[in-house]
Amino acid sequence: EDLTRLLAVNFNALLEAQPDAAAQGWGPIVGVTGDDGLFTEIYGQPTAASVIEFLLWNPLNPNAVISCVTRARENARSVREQISSEMWERINRLYFRVKDADRAAVMRNPHEFSLLVRDGSQGFQGVTLTTLSHGEGYEFIRLGHHLERADKTTRILAAKYAYISRLPATSSETSLQLIALLRS
């Protein structure tokens, strides 16, 4: 969810940026995941298309959305007797929506895909809250959710700070990047 939001926000911010700034703006997005080495090995220089493809679809990227959703589905299947049927239905539905998404449409408008993933993730969290007994398993899910959020927040701040600190303080690009940071 956080990764797709980051992609959509930065995609829109970089549309308004100068061409050279837009080209440089994609690298920090990969840096948020900590997979810049793998990205460079596969693609070389970051472009909008290569970053979106890497972060959403590339099966070699363990942090790609498709990889995360696939693992979540496999994990849910392995504990299916301990989760509610609604939880299984939500994660399964999200898996098929991500797997079957029109990749060309996503490349043109990552925002719609971000909404799809966000709705799937939040729907899963909602049915978890309302259908799972609030015991150890529930607390484990909540702990994982909060750890993931804290990790992504610190990575986003570090990557954006490194990029923004190299820009002139008065440039419009700095303002665009600060707005993107707040929306991420």
Where are these regions (language model features)?
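Alpha-helical transmembrane segments and their helix-helix packing motifs
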Residues: 2-184
